[in-house]
Amino acid sequence: MEKIRTRYAPSPTGYLHVGGARTAIFNFLLAKHFNGEFIIRIEDTDTERNVEGGIESQLENLRWLGIIPDESIYNPGNYGPYIQSQKLATYKKLAYELVGKGLAYRCFCTKEKLEHERQLALEHHQTPKYLGTCRNLHSKHIQTNLDNQVPFTIRLKINQDAEFAWNDQVRGKITIPGNSLTDIVLLKANGIATYNFAVVIDDHDMEITDVLRGAEHISNTAYQLAINQALGYQRIPRFGHLSVIVDKSGKKLSKRDTKTIQFIEQFKQEGYLPEAVVNFLALLGWNSDFNREFFTINQLIESFTVNRVVGAPAFFDIKKLQWINAHYIKELSDNAYFNFIDNYLTIDFDYLKNKRKEVSLLFKNQLAFGIEINQLIKETFAPKLGVQHLSVKHRELFKELQSALQQLSEQLQALPDWTKDNVKSTLTQIGEQFNLKGKKLFMPLRLIFTNKEHGPDLAGIMVLHGKTQVLALLQEFIHATNLF
C-alpha cells in the first residue's frame, strides 16, 4: 500500500486564519489516520504579499495547535527544499523545457495591453481571458523581441478542446472544459514561477498523494491538471475541496471582518485552549460516525476519513467554540487550570490580590474563554453592595428572612475556621432549619454578597469577601426590616 503524504502549503502573508488552520488540520488527520506523513511547505513566490515574520507566525501557531509536521523547513526530510524561493532555478528550467517542446510560449504582451483586454471583456459582460496574441508568434518575431530585451512571461498552451476532470474526494466528479481556461502564466517576467506552476512541481517532487484544500482552488485544479499533463507527470495527487466557511449571515467568512475573531493568534490571546480550537475546526465540514462533539487529537486521528467530509458551507459559530472551550476548561485539573488562567488574570481589588488561585478556581465552571475571567470577577466583586442598592423587586425576596439571617450570622460568627466547607455546611443547616430550599435562601444571599441573582459558588464568594465583611453585610440586612 502506498504511503499517504499530505501537505499544508501556506504563503507567509500574515497570521494563520481559521480557514488555513482547518486545511492544515484535515491534511494532518488524513495522513496520521493512515500512518502517513504530513508536510509543511512554504509557498513564498508572491514576494509582493509576503510579510516579515509570516513564516514563523504560521508555523508557531500550528505548533500551538499541536499540528506538528513530519517534514518542514525546521525538520527537513529527503524531499526539500521546503520553501519555494529556494527552488526557483528548478521551476525556470522546467518552464523553458516546455517552451522547447512547444507546450509553452513566451508572451511579450505588456501589462497595459492585458489590462485593456480585460476591461473590454468586462464591458461586454465576458469572463476576462488572454486572447492568445503571442501564442503563434513567428520565430523571427520572437528573436527580435529577445534581441531587444523585451520583457516576457511564459504561458502554457491550454488545449481548448480538452476536458480536465477529476474525482474530487469531497465533491465527486468535476469536469472543467478547456475552452473555459486561459493560457496560464507559468513564469513571470521577473523569472519567478507562478503559484500554479510551482505547486505542481513541488507536489510531484515531494510525492504528495492527497491534497485537501479550500473550494476556491477548484478552478486552479484544472490548470494544475493541464500543467501535470504538459510536464508528463504520471503520478497526480488525489484532490478534495473543502466547504466554504461562512458567517451567521451565510456569507463567506472575510478576513476584513474585524468584529469576528478568526485568526489563531487571536484565540491564543483571548484564552482558548488549543485542544478546543482543533476540536471545533475539525467539525467545520467533517461529520464523525459517532454522535458526539468532543474529540481529543488522537480520537480525531482514529475517526477521520475523507468520505465523512462534506462540501456544504460550514457555519463558523463562535458560541459553539466557546461551549467546546468551556468543556475543555472544566476538564483541566485545578493546577493545570490555574497555570492556564493565570496568564489572563488581572485582579485590581486589593483584598483579592493575594488570593489569585482561590479567585480563579471560583470561576472554573463558568468560563467560556480565559480573558473572560476578569469580567466575571468584576461582575461578582465590584457591584455596590447593601440594602440601598437593591431593586424593589429584589427587596421582596427578603420578607420574613430576618430570623434566618440572624441565625446564619450567629453561626458564621461562631465558626472556628473561615473555610468554604464550613461556610457551605452552615448554609445547608440554615436552609434545613428554616425550611428554605434552593432559591428561597440562596438567591437572597447572592443579592447580599454580589447584588446578582446568579453566579459562581456562593460559599466561595463569601470566603473571599472575608468573615468581617460578610457579617457586616448580614447585619445591615437584618436591621433593615423597615425596607422589606
Curated annotation (Swiss-Prot):
It is an enzyme of class 6 (ligase). Belongs to the class-I aminoacyl-tRNA synthetase family. Glutamate--tRNA ligase type 1 subfamily. The keyword Zinc does not apply. A motif ('HIGH' region) lies at residues 10-20. GO terms for biological process: glutamyl-tRNA aminoacylation. Keywords: Aminoacyl-tRNA synthetase, ATP-binding, Cytoplasm, Ligase, Nucleotide-binding, Protein biosynthesis. It comes from Mycoplasma pneumoniae (strain ATCC 29342 / M129 / Subtype 1). A motif ('KMSKS' region) lies at residues 252-256. Catalyzes the attachment of glutamate to tRNA(Glu) in a two-step reaction: glutamate is first activated by ATP to form Glu-AMP and then transferred to the acceptor end of tRNA(Glu). This is Glutamate--tRNA ligase. ATP binds at K255. Monomer. It catalyses: tRNA(Glu) + L-glutamate + ATP = L-glutamyl-tRNA(Glu) + AMP + diphosphate. GO terms for molecular function: ATP binding; glutamate-tRNA ligase activity; tRNA binding; zinc ion binding. The gene is gltX. NCBIfam families: gltX_bact. It is found in: Cytoplasm. Its EC number is 6.1.1.17. Its main location: cytoplasm. PROSITE patterns: AA_TRNA_LIGASE_I (PS00178). One of its GO terms (cellular component) is cytosol.
